[in-house]
Amino acid sequence: MNLVICVLLLSIWKNNCMTTNQTNGSSTTGDKPVESMQTKLNYLRRNLLILVGIIIMVFVFICFCYLHYNCLSDDASKAGMVKKKGIAAKSSKTSFSEAKTASQCSPETQPMLSTADKSSDSSSPERASAQSSTEKLIRPSSLQKPSIPNSAGKLTRPSYPKRSSKSSCSKKLSKSSHLEKAHKKGSLEKLCKLDYACKLASSDKPVRPPQLFKPLYSSHPQNEISPSKPFGPQELAKPPKHFNPKRSVSLGRAALLSNSELAETCQPYKKKHLVAKTYRPLVNDISEAKEKNTQNLHVSSKVKSSSRSFRKLDSRNNAYGDHVNDSDTMKYYSEVDSDKVIIITCDRGYNQVTSEVTLND
């Protein structure tokens, strides 16, 4: 820019010198007043041009300086903002880390953790094994340690204590629910095994082992007796499918019950077994007849030997004789009394069963 200005100034100075020389030569030849007016006008024009050029150059220079200064100021302000943001981020990080260390080192977190452990232990009081009792004895002794090594151990942990506490709480809740389910299953199995032990004590023949499912009861449970099928010693000796070591203590206690308690609990089963045992062959034959004819017939397992029962049965036979076919009757010869014949007739239309006892002469 300075070079351009110098060149313009030199050109203007040369023109001025040339004009002065021409004016000196012409003054000697022509009229003086006319030449003097023309020279003055030319001189003014040149001076005006020089002033306009100088003004333009100064304006351009000022604009350039202004733009350059604005750009530098914008860059400086941006750099200052970035520095301020970096300083604020560093200060926030340091304050957050200090707060974490203070919260970890504070002794208030120790009783909170101990209360959480105690609540999780109290939420599962149904544990009935030796291992759980030993763990409960060990836990309070471990909680009585000083808080200084605990705080030092917490400082070595990663910077995400909240997530670990949430995961530990979820694990404890899942363990407690699992233990409650296992205790319920163990109580059901205990009841089934008590029934099975009572049946074994009351009967001479092997009995079906207990199963954990609800039996399907019919609409007339009093008139229905299902014969028990014998099982071999191999099937009785099979262990359960799902073995749980936590139930071993409860099952051992159930197995160590005294004979007197078993006898007291098995009295109703003995009565039922005696009734079913006296009429077992009769019930087996009735079940075969039911399979041949229909499955919805209800069979009575007792036959009265009094004269009134004979009269009632004769009247029923006379009343329902029209509805009975030859295929609906069945004869049973008992092993004890060879002179007695038991005839059982099944009525399909009325869903009733009548029986007769006649003597062979």
Curated annotation (Swiss-Prot):
Domain of life: Eukaryota
Stated name of the protein: Uncharacterized protein CXorf66
Glycosylation sites: 24
Signal sequence interval, chain numbering: 1-19
Membrane topology, record value: Single-pass type I membrane protein
Compartment list: Membrane
Compositional bias annotation for Low complexity: 114-133, 299-308
PANTHER family documented for this protein: GENE 7073-RELATED
A GO CC annotation given for this chain: membrane
Residue numbers spanned by region Disordered: 99-184, 209-247, 295-316
Transmembrane segments: 48-68
Annotated keywords: Glycoprotein, Membrane, Signal, Transmembrane, Transmembrane helix
Segments on the Cytoplasmic face: 69-361
Extracellular membrane side: 20-47
Keyword Glycoprotein: yes
InterPro entries in UniProt: CXorf66
Biased composition (Polar residues): 99-113, 141-150
